[in-house]
Structures are given as structure tokens and as C-alpha cells.
Amino acid sequence: MTSPEAVDIPFEPKKILAQLPHMPGVYRYYDTAGAVLYVGKARDLKKRVSSYFTKTQLSPRIAMMVTRIARIETTVTRSEAEALLLENNLIKALAPRYNILFRDDKSYPYLKLTAHRFPRMAYYRGSVDKQNQYFGPFPSAWAVRESIQILQRVFQLRTCEDSVFNNRTRPCLLHQIGRCTAPCVGAISADDYAIDVSNAARFLLGRQSEVMKELEQKMHAFAAELKFEQAAAVRNQMSSLATVLHQQAIEVGSDSDVDILAVVAQGGRVCVNLAMVRGGRHLGDKAYFPAHVESALTLAEGGLGDEADGADGADEAAAALPGEPADEAAAARDAASAASSASSASVEAEVLDAFIAQHYLGNRVPPVLVVSHAPASRDLLELLSEQAGHKVSLVRQPQGQRRAWLSMAEQNARLALARLLSEQGSQQARTRALAETLSFECDDLAMLRIECFDISHTMGEATQASCVVYHHHKMQSGEYRRYNITGITPGDDYAAMRQVLTRRYEKMVEQAAQAAAADDAAGIDGESTRQAEASSLLPNIVLIDGGKGQVEIARQVFTELGLDTSMLVGVAKGEGRKVGLETLVFADGRTPLELGKESAALMLVAQIRDEAHRFAITGMRAKRAKARQTSRLEELEGVGAKRRQRLLARFGGLRGVVAASVEELASVEGISHALAEQIYKQLH
């Protein structure tokens, strides 16, 4: 790995490029502030990195990136496959400004069958283990819940928590309506229930005909033994399964597990539509919109063009280093241009490469990927197969049912992209309307940063404050923050608002002051990059959910911190808290403003204010529920933190502990029979 160049030393690419090896690896570009600009992988580091400094027709955006490079770091790997894996990990961890980025969505839902004697089926998100059975992943929560409803109707598996299952004395409502066989009260044997679980698992794996055939044999066997009630029950089960299969006839194909990936570029944005087929059933799709894909624009619109992140072959053709003979450098550039034209790697292929790497590496991969475009990287498929432990096939021109699925995915991608572009236009119009209403001047409205605060509590209990952020014409959920409010009189919203504003902005003001002091000491005139970064953390507009009282508190805090009070805007609720009746209250003495129901500016204010309220109240409820759940157990004599944790884990919560018998309490590790009796008496 090359040693990082110090930021204060002038960047000299010739010296750095001369030291790079002809080996596979990963390279990283940094700017003067130490921020990562780009992460890439190469079959030949020397040729790949050199191409950025020898090409004569870089797209405007890549050319701008090159001018910002102040430091280069490289990591040598044993193979290009290792470089690809390291590149993917670094892109996810560092989120470089010039890489194509997808939101790291690791929370795909699964349908879980637990390892219980009477397995429970449940909706599940998170990492999977080997103890339980997991089916999926599914594209949405709706797809999981629909599958659970189907299994309830056909196989009648239980869905109740173990703590409920262990404490039932009579069947629940689901048994009465034919959605559960009530194993909790012994209405079905463990062997018969295991058969239902096996059939349900095979159904999820796409072996429906096999299940139907076994059920038919079972029905005839019962009839031959004159067990007509059991035969009728199996017949009803077959009827339910046949109904489900008929309803899903359009969705079911011969494939078991397939993912369909359709990429569409339009209007400067790209959409990747991922459709999932599991067990032969089409489970729906999900649209992804990557960031940093300005190459979706044409060159005339300021995009990257195809050469920005082209295949290694094109870049390696331009391998002439600075200082080589001019004719050789020119020949290399001509070769690079020809290679780039020959490869003509589209933005769709680049985006597909990025999606496959970021979505599948390290996660489950189905055996077949049906794609709308051929990926640019050949090594990616080999690496996926190696990591998955099975061959992963890529189908570019599908036939039959797969072709219909791909066509549907492409259509859904176009619709999702059109909807996004429409919403973006509407949101940008709202941002512009708000800026005009508040007489706020901003050269780039996308950089307008709005923060909104709300206080939530229940009669003074579990007081929490929320801060939500609106930036780049959308809510930035990753920048949301909750603040636990302590040391105030319960129910004092003014004190809570003072505390959260002080905690939020005091540190930002200190950072800006430190940056300015450091620049003064260094003799830097004007605003340096360090000062600009510190100042960029401060919002342009601060919305306060409240009227004159809350705005006055905010004004006092901002005055104490030396901040501009003109950015403070209170949102006073109208009659009945209806949208359209709000009044904007200003901290700098401007006349309160009523905008009316049709105001685009007010729609944006209401959107941000409602999001702050939602974020605050969900946090407050979670905090309150946690406090109420644990407080009663904390009062139990003889029960410390470890025993309390074991009780909650064993019975699933306070309600399960209260419902447990003395014998069940005594079965928990660390709790004797005498202590169990004491706990039982204290809870009843």
C-alpha cells in the first residue's frame, strides 16, 4: 500500500504514478480536506490510475474530480476478484462522492419457521442463523404477510409468541376460524403438526404439486380406513391449496428462485427494479434509485459520458505515463479512445455492476439472475458463485415466462422513475416557494438546509425532543436525531426546547469558532475549506413546532450562541390542528404570516413539521413502553439485572412474566423455587 501523501505537500501525480505497481488492487482518491472522492478497482493499478491523468477528453464531471485530487492511496491484492470485493466493502463504508451508490438495505424481510417442537411461523428482519428455517428474502413486508396468511389458510400453522403458546389453556380465535390447529392445547399431535410444517416448507420452496399429490394419497388412505372426518379435513386442505394455486396461476413458473434486474435511465436518474421469484412464485418487486449517477445525463447536459468509469480495458489502453515520449502517449490515447468506443459500456451496465456488487456480495444470491443489460465486469459473476457456494447463472435474453417477468420489471422501472421525477419536480417547486415566501436568497436551492424540532411526552413522562432534516429537496432520515430531555420540571415544554436547541447548536458553534481561530493562526484570509465545512453544518432555516412562547425561547438560545435569529420560524397550529390554518411566527419581529391551504410553501412546512412530530412521538412511546415494562421488574426484591434479563428472554416481556406460574418461574436459570414464589406473590 502506498503511503498517504501529506495534504499540505503539493500534489504531484507524476511522482506518485511512477511508483505504482503493475498489479491488481484498489485505489482511492482524496481531496484537500481528506474526504474520499472515489474508490475503484483495477487489474493493473499503474495503467488504471494513470488513465485519469493521461486522457484528453474526460467528461466534465470526471475532469472536475481529477482537479480535486490531493492524495492517492492504493492497496495491492492477490487477484482482481479480491480487488472487487475490497472495492465493494470500501464503497459501502466510505460512500465516496463520485461512486455510484445504492442505499445499503440489509433489512430484507424473511418468513421464519422457528426451531420449536411446534414451530411458529413469523415475519422476520435481521441476520439469519442455522437454528431456524428462513424463506426469502422477500421484496416487501406485504409479500411476507401474504405468504403467512396463505400458510395459515392451508396448513394452519401457529403464529403466536412462545410466551403466549406456553401459557394458553384454551384455543384462541384463530383456531375457531380455521387458521390454526391449536397445538398449544394439544388439539394436534406433534407428528401431525410436523407434517404440516414440512408441507408448508415445501410449498414455500415451490414444490406445490408434490404437496398436493401427498395430500391426495392421505385423503384416500383415510377414506379406505373409513375415517371420513379426517378425509374431509384433508379434502378441505387440498381445496384451499388448489384455490391458492389457481389465484396465483399467473405468477407461478417452473423456476424455483430467480431475481429479475431491470435498469432504466431517464432524465438524469437511474432506476434498478428488482423482482423476486421464490419457490416459483412471483413475490413482487422493489425500485432502487442510486446516488451519484450523473452519467445518466448526456454530455451536453453535463453528464459523465461513457468513459467516466469504463471497463478496465479501455483505461488500460491509455497507460502512457507522464514523461513518456509524446508519440507513445498519443498512441496510447488513441488506443484508449478506440477501446472506449468499442466497449461502449452504457450507464445501465455500470449501474447494474454497482447494484449486483453492493446488493449481493456477502448476502444470499439465487442461482439465476435475469438482467436487462450485460454487466461490464466478468469477474463479478465468478466471485458471486464462489461466495454463494453454488453456480450463479446470468441470463441476458430470457425466453418464455422469464421474458415476461423481465418485461414487467422494465415497465415497473419506467413507471417508478417517472413517478420519482414527477415527485422531485413537485418537491423542488415547494422548496422554491418556501424560499420566496421567507425572502430567503439561495443560489442553489438543493443546498437549502431546514431543521425542525418537536417535543413529545405523556403528562411529563418520557420527554423526548426530535430534530429532522430537510436537504437536497427531501427528508434526510439518516441525519435525524432524538434527544432525551432530563433535569427539567415534567411537562415544561419551554425548558425542553431550550435544552434541545442548546445541545444541538452549541457544539456546532464551537466547531466553527475553532476552525476560524485555526485559520487566523495560520494567516489564512477569507473562509477556508475547514470553515466552510463547519458552517455548512448549520441550517439555513430552523422550524419550531410551536407559537410565540417556543419561538421566544429559541430566540434567546440563538442570541446567547451568537446565531442569526432570522432563521427561526415557529409553526403555530390553527384551529383543530388542520393543515392550512397554521401561522408562521418569526423570531426577528416580522409580522406573523398565514399562507392558506393552497400554498406550496405551507405544504412543505407541514410535511417537515409532521415528520418531526412523528419521529418524536414514536421515540417517546418506545421510551415510555421500555420504562413501564422494566420498572415493575426492577422493583422486585431478589431480582437483579441478570435475572431480570433472563425472565424477559424466557417469557417475552412483563406480561409473560406476570402470567407465568411458580413452576415456570422456577425453571428459569438462577431462580430457585423459593424466589419464584416470592416473585409470584409480588406480581399478584
Curated annotation (Swiss-Prot):
Keywords, ordered alphabetically: Cytoplasm, DNA damage, DNA excision, DNA repair, Excision nuclease, SOS response
Subunit annotation: Interacts with UvrB in an incision complex.
Localization annotation: Cytoplasm
Domain GIY-YIG span(s) in chain numbering: 22-100
GO biological process: nucleotide-excision repair; SOS response
GO MF term list: DNA binding; excinuclease ABC activity
InterPro entries named in the record: GIY-YIG_endonuc, GIY-YIG_endonuc_sf, GIY-YIG_UvrC_Cho, Hlx-hairpin-Hlx_DNA-bd_motif, RuvA_2-like, UVR_dom, UVR_dom_sf, UvrABC_protein_C
SUPFAM superfamilies to which the protein is assigned, alphabetical: C-terminal UvrC-binding domain of UvrB (SSF46600), GIY-YIG endonuclease (SSF82771), RuvA domain 2-like (SSF47781)
Biological classification of the source: Bacteria, Pseudomonadati, Pseudomonadota, Betaproteobacteria, Burkholderiales
Keyword presence, Cytoplasm: yes
Domain UVR: 209-244
Name of the protein in its database record: UvrABC system protein C
Organism: Burkholderia ambifaria (strain MC40-6)
Entry GO terms, CC: cytoplasm; excinuclease repair complex
Family to which the UniProt record says this protein belongs: Belongs to the UvrC family.
Known function: The UvrABC repair system catalyzes the recognition and processing of DNA lesions. UvrC both incises the 5' and 3' sides of the lesion. The N-terminal half is responsible for the 3' incision and the C-terminal half is responsible for the 5' incision.
SMART domains per the UniProt record, alphabetical: GIYc (SM00465), HhH1 (SM00278)
